[in-house]
Each structure stands twice: as C-alpha cells, then as structure tokens.
C-alpha cells in the first residue's frame, strides 16, 4: 500500500516476463472505473475510502458530471506476490457505445483484458461487442462478475438462488465465446478448402473429414470461463471485496483436511460435502444437497451482510474475531452499513489481491505473444504473410523475441493521439527551489524593501545598487524606475500564460520490440505505407536513412523527443522504455494524425487498421459566431480530428465545415472540446444533418389503405406515371418499360439507359465488400496507366472471385441473365452499392476483365469516351433527383451507345481541316520552313483522328457525354417508383417491467419498431431490441430516461439502411384514401416530410404553399 517511486517503476519495466498489459472492458455502468479505483488504491495512489467515489481515471470534467468514461487512459501499478514483482499496465476503457473506438485503441496495445459483467444485468449488448473486439485482436480475457452485493441487497436472493443466477451468467458468456470460436474454426476450414482447390495434389475426401473434425479436434477448453480454471473472480467493487475459489480452497484445505487441488475442482459445480465421511460427493441437485460453493462461500458472505444490515453487533464482533481482523472504532460506530461492510470485507477478501493475482497467473506477458497474432497485426485482409519481402518476414522473430538488445529493431505502435494541457507536462511543472535560489530571492526582496523605504523618506541609501548606479533621492525619480522594473517583471507572464494554454499531443503507444530511447531517429509509417514501395525506390544495402532518400508515400522520419510513463492524470518523464511497455510519446503531432507504426527499419509494414464497432453517422455543420474567427475554428477542428480516433471532419461542396460523430453523447463531447480546448471560440451548431439514400422499387401491389390495387387505381397510377413523364423535357424518348433514350446537345451521340432496383441481398453484398471493390478499382487504374504498383495477391484474387460468385448467386432470372459479367462500374465514388451495366453491342467492357478489344480503332474510340460515361454515372449516383442524396441499390443498364454521327462529323471536319491546310501550305511561294511546319500540323491532326474530342458551341464532347449520361440516369430513375431510404439504429433497451409500456410508447412515437423482447432470468429486467430511424433518435435517450424515471437506458448503434414504405410523391386516388388521408395527404406522408426537410436545408425548391385561403385566417366581423 506504499506509493512506489519512479525509480521502482523503471526497474520493473526492464523485466519483460513480469509485465502485464491489460485493459478493463464492459458494458456501460458495470463497474469498470470503480474496479480500476480499487486496484489503484492498492498502490497507495488514492485512499481506499475514496475508491469508487473518486473515479480517478476519469480526469475530464464531463466524465465526472455524466458518470461515464469517455476515453481510454492508462496507469502503471506494482503488484508483489511471494518473491515475484509484477508491473501491471492497466487501461480503463469506456463502456458507452458512442466511445467504442476508444476500446479499439486500448485493446490493440494489450495482451489480455478483464471482462466485467454486472451480476444482476448479466451479458449485455456492449459486453458482446467488447468480447468480440478482444477476440478479433487475439488477446486473452479473464472474467470479473461484479456487483454481487446487488444480489443480496436489491434482489434479496438466497445463496442457492444467487448460485443458479451466477451459473446462468457464466453459461451465457461461454456460449458467446463458443460462437466466436466456432466461426473462427469454420473460417480456417474454408481457407484450407480454398488452398486445397488451388493445390491439385490434395487428397480426395479430405473436405468431408475436415467437416467432421474441424470443431472436435480443436482444443477449446482454455477459452472458456470457469472458476476452477482460476479465470473467474466474483467481486463487489463498491464494497471493496472480491475472491476467486483458490482463496477459499487454500483456507478449507487446512480446516477440512482435503487437498487444495481437489477443492479447486469441486468448489464450483454439482458437488457437495459429506461431513461425516469428509468426502466430496457429486450430484447435489439429485440429492437435495447444497453445493460446495453455496455452503462454504456464499453463505458466509450472506451471513456477514445480514449481520451488518440488521446491525447485530454481537454477530459482527464474532465474525470479525473469527476472521482475525482489526476494525477501527470509527468504522465500527458508523451508521452507514456500507462503511462497515467495506471495512470488514476489504481486509477479509481484498479485491485488488484477487484480481491482480488472477491477472498475473492467467494473462500472458509480452513475451508470450503468439505467431498468429503477429501475422494478423502485420497482414491486412488482402495480404498474406508469405507475400511480404524477406526483410519484412524477418521482423516476425523480433516480435516474438521482444528483445531489448541494441541490435533489435525498435517497433512501436501508436494507437491514438490524445491532448493534454501543456502545463501538465513534467518539464513544465513548477519544481521546488534550491537553497541558493531561495537565498537569492530573499536578498532581492530585502533590497526592494530598502529601496521603497528610502523612496518614501526621500533619502538615498549610502551604498550603490548591484549594477553600480546610485539610487536617486527624489521620489519622483524613483517612480519611473519602479514602473520600468514592474513592466519588466510583468512582461513575460502573458507570454507564459499563452504558451501554457496550448494543447500538447501525446501518442498513446506500446513498444513491441527494441528499446525506445529519447532522441532516437525512427521511421513513421502511415496506415497506407507499403514496404514494397520503399524497397522499389531505395537501392539495396542502405545503412542509415540519409537526407537524399527519395520521397516514399506515407512515410516520415523523425526523432523521439519525449517519453512519458502514463500514470492516469499524471505523466512522468522517462529517458528510455524497454520492450513490452505502454508509454506516451511527445513531439509526434506533426507526423501522426490518428494512429501509426514507428520502426527503426523501413521494411516493417504498418499494423492493420483498428476495428471500430460504431460507425460515425451523426453530422452537424459548425461555424464561428464571429466570421473573423474562422481561422481559429479551422485550426481547432484539425486538433479535434487528431485528438479523437472516431470523429470525422469534412468540408462540403457548399463550404460548410461538418463534424461526423458516433452519437449524441460523442457529438456533445466533441463540441465541448472544440469550444473550450481547441478553438476556444463561440460557435454556432446546425441541426443534425440526417443522412438519407434514394432508391427505386417495384410497382406496389397494394394501396396506402392495404387494399389490392384495382382497375380504378391502376388507371390513376398510369395517369400519375404519364404526369411524371410529362415533366421530362421534350426530345427525350421514354418507352413503356422505362427505357430513356437521350442525345447529346450537339446530336452526335445517343444513349439508351434503363434503371432497375437491385435485390436487397445484392445491395448488402456490395456494402460489405466496398473495400474489395476499391482495391479492384485501384488495380484497374494502375494497370491502365501502365504501372504495376498494385500487385494482386492470391488472397485478393480469391476474394474477388468469391465476391463475383455471390453476385451471380443472387442475380438470377431472365432480367439478370449474364449481367454480372457485364458490370462496368460501381458507384458512387467507384465503390458504392450501385451498378452500371454495359449491354452495348459496339463496345464491351467489364470491371472483371477490362476492355474486350484494345486493338481496333473503333474500340479505342469507345474506350477513350467510356470514361465520360462512367463519370456521368458516378455523378448521377452521388446525388439523386429527389433531394440530391446518394443513390443505393440501383442498377443502371446502358442498352445502347451510338457514336456513328460523331464519327461521320469527325471525319468530315478532319477532311475540311486537311483541305484548308493543303491550300494554306501550297497557296504561295513561301519558304521551305513554312511548308514543313504546315505538313507537321497536318500530320499531327491526322494522327489524332478519332481520339481528340470535338469541341463546338456546346463545349468539349467528353463533357457533353458526362452531362447526358447523368441526365439519362436521373430521368430513368424518375420514371420508376422512387423511395427514400432512412439510416436505422439498432436500439437495445434494458428496462424493468413496470416501465415497459412507457418504453413502447416512446418507441412508437418516434417511428421505432420492436424486434424482440426477452426477460432476464431471475430478475425483473427486460431487454428490448428495436430499430429506430436516425432522424427520430435525437433526444430519444433523454426522453426515455425522463418517461421511465431513469429505469431504462438505451444503447444506439448504426445498423443498416431501410426503405421508407410510403411514396414521397403519392397523392390519394380512391374514396377510401381521400377519407383516410384527406385531400392533400401531406400530414401522414413521412417520406415527403423527410424529403422536403432535406430540400429546404439544401436550398432546393420545395413544392408547398405557405398560405392558402388567407381570408379564412382573418376575423372579418366583430362579435358584439
């Protein structure tokens, strides 16, 4: 319990085998920060009485106000057991879903994690999410079941009921672990199948054998949580106690005389003790006996709580005496039972010992990093470890060794950048004065006092001052000198204050190999850096990076300026950090944006990107209240973008500065940081910018009152379609199937385009494979430019063919025949969920194979102008006709592309120009040089036949094609049934039974839809799973807490896009619809409301009347 010195921590850092890098993960309000407080108090950093109340790791003011953790923060703890001393680098992480990106940054630099579960609420949605993140990062978890006291105090469980409840929680979390394990085994099996297909020498029948043994032959016993394995601890962090069954096994082995190993296996499970025979028997439930866990452990804890809550002083004294504890008189006389329980239990079952002992025994050290995790960190999804150059593959051994030799390469990963006040840095903190400085200050103060007395009496001192000048006797002469001295002493202070107000950025990092020393030169590798690119540009055999190295993309070179030991709110200065430790690095703000890999060798690949569970979806536009402060806002947004791993900063085409965040709480934190820390100005924030998507659907079969569309309605629908088509300008042909035929303004090219809705499964496949589509586009563009920078890997090729196979599987039927092979492009931004299909007979081009024929001049001409067609498609999918939002789930089919008139016009124009050139060159007796120049110009024009786009009064022909293709796509959309797509949240709500009706009322009011409702066994808690439009989510959490008096708390995570069923352009046609919806039907049409709101925000035309029948709004006659 003694506060450790910095020297002690530096000494512990050098023993890599005894380092444990761990993070605490849990659902919100399950007790992570309280548990961290208890562990911190064991080192004497805070008082044990303040544990759970101080929330030491929550250093932000808004964290203390809201009572939730918003950022990951680290602290180093010392733990001694027996002859071993351990250094625990503990990282506390948030549990709120808005800050799940902070969990990702913490998990990446850890080797193990503590999963905290509330004993009452059990496994919650965010528990599943953090366990999945730990699994993806290949780190080992241990389990802490917290808040056991709630089972006693709140739910009034008996020990037997509590045991059954705890068993259910363990079963739930082990079932989740089993699901993750099964998916991993099946993925590995699928990879082996793919390799066996590539390798023809594989034995037949192996696939069937793998199917039956993939799960059976894999040992998964070490993955599951079980108290007998020692990876589960039962705690009450607020009361300061916790235990593993090893503690009681050691005690009862001495009392009962049964071996400790036997008790370790039987204290948890269906075992009971036969006291007469002193034997442990199996089958407690069948024989109606109490399990050992209930009889020997839970009943003792229950009896203690019962005695304290009932204030049975005699029983309390008896328990304290039997346990050999010493309780202070203050705690014994205290009226609050919690104080007495804490005083007794923290001595009897100290939580810090139970948790830290489990961490040291069950979680790995940095030396135990697995080869699988190393390869996963180094390889992105499109690369395999074998595809790296030999220099890169050799680094795997350095990862595994985690050596501190001078020859070992230094490898550091920066998971995030965080901002601290410059005054909080160790070098800027005030230090204690030395004796000499104190004496000098005393002498100067005495001298100033003597001068003031002399000035007041009008007498000069006999001795001169230190600088040799005599002090004037006149008080008036003294005043200017005194003022001058005052100005000199006060001048530096504003400058210092201004410097101290600046934010300094610290890199949150971990050393994986080598020793990080202050001043060491190192490469900074961005997420997109490629070691192959470096080795291609830099000659072999270079030793140190000289200044003459060529520019390599996404790589910089800098020195490690300052190294810090992270101690929660404090930072300690370090000269060097051995491998395996977590540290802070100063001076990287100009080189690292959010995350980066630091390495002394440029052959190191960047670590794979972090896995973010939450997608940024909430957008607001910000601007300064005073326009002159725009530079401060821009600078502040840059700093905010660097300080937050999840936030996105965008500048739209309109010039708006847009902030994209993960949710309302995250948005509020970002705005507070912008106003108070980074920009320090007053800002105006717009209403949330709701994202929508536009799409088309099949014609409906039922009307708005759920009746089958009859003849009268079909006539009305046809009439409505004709009205829609009448809005299309003249000269554009529309057939009955929605085929749009349009010509360019100069009438030289004709395009025929049709729009079709994609099946929902295909849209989902396109969304899931957007990164793969982007890689395909980069590969295609590099090949077209004659470069070979993007070498395709075998794994990527397999993914591409798998992606194509999925599309072929879902695009079946007469309409979609052979359409996958004819896909020309994806959009928007060439990787979106829309497809351009080329069915033109004159020119065949596919995204899978490229242009079919590059040799013929005609195909070359089509290929050159094809980029204009694709650009028009990209523009059309980027902004739809309804409210200029991106399209989703639409297939545009280019049925015809006629360039015959363009070729004729080009040939005739070229002939005329050639004739004029001939006449000019042969028309007179010019000298030979002029004739040579004319012939060269003619040859140049001739060589560009069919390749140079014609330019006329309508502009370049390529630009006309872009605009025409864009208009064709928009008109093809408008002749189909259009729909809006809304972004949807998955909403998980935990509520008690008595407020369930209010929860449903709030959900229905906000257009929510309940998907599932289940009751937590043994409690009165319900878990409601619903979907809620993002547009209706603002203020939802506050409203539901108000309506339920804080008994329900929602967790909102972006899930998917969903089509709004109502047609935004629908008008009533039948009598039933007129009666139900009224003449205008604008009050019930949710899609129209959303569409008009977006159009108003963007300044587009909105078809609505502001005032109608104004005389009805006036009182024309006075009532007497």
Curated annotation (Swiss-Prot):
Pfam families: EFG_C, EFG_III, EFL1, GTP_EFTU. The keyword GTP-binding applies. Changing residue 96 to A: Loss of GTPase activity. Abolishes dissociation of EIF6 from 60S pre-ribosome subunits. Its EC number is 3.6.5.-. The keyword Kinase does not apply. Residues 438-452, 475-484 have a biased composition (Basic and acidic residues). CDD domains: aeEF2_snRNP_like_IV, eEF2_snRNP_like_C, EF2, EF2_II, EF2_snRNP_III. Coiled coil: none annotated. Keywords: Acetylation, Disease variant, Elongation factor, GTP-binding, Hydrolase, Nucleotide-binding, Protein biosynthesis, Ribosome biogenesis. Transmembrane segments: none annotated. GTP binds at residues 26-33, 92-96, 146-149. It comes from the Eukaryota. GO terms for cellular component: cytosol; ribonucleoprotein complex. Residues 17-272 form the tr-type G domain. One of its GO terms (biological process) is cytosolic ribosome assembly. GTPase involved in the biogenesis of the 60S ribosomal subunit and translational activation of ribosomes. Together with SBDS, triggers the GTP-dependent release of EIF6 from 60S pre-ribosomes in the cytoplasm, thereby activating ribosomes for translation competence by allowing 80S ribosome assembly and facilitating EIF6 recycling to the nucleus, where it is required for 60S rRNA processing and nuclear export. NCBIfam families: small_GTP (TIGR00231). This is Elongation factor-like GTPase 1.
